[in-house]
């Protein structure tokens, strides 16, 4: 999970 609730800064935007 590159982008998820745990890593919203990984590419959630």
UniProtKB/Swiss-Prot annotation:
Keywords: Hydrolase, NAD, One-carbon metabolism
UniProt name for this protein: Adenosylhomocysteinase 2
Family stated for the protein in its record: Belongs to the adenosylhomocysteinase family.
Gene Ontology biological process terms from the UniProt entry: one-carbon metabolic process
Subunit composition and interactions: Homotetramer.
Record's cofactor remark: Binds 1 NAD(+) per subunit.
Organism: Populus euphratica (Euphrates poplar)
Top EC class, one word: hydrolase
Organism ancestry: Eukaryota, Viridiplantae, Streptophyta, Embryophyta, Tracheophyta
Pathway(s) the chain acts in: Amino-acid biosynthesis; L-homocysteine biosynthesis; L-homocysteine from S-adenosyl-L-homocysteine: step 1/1
Positions of transmembrane segments: none
UniProt keyword annotation of Hydrolase present: yes
One MF term in the entry's GO annotations: adenosylhomocysteinase activity
CC cofactor: NAD(+)
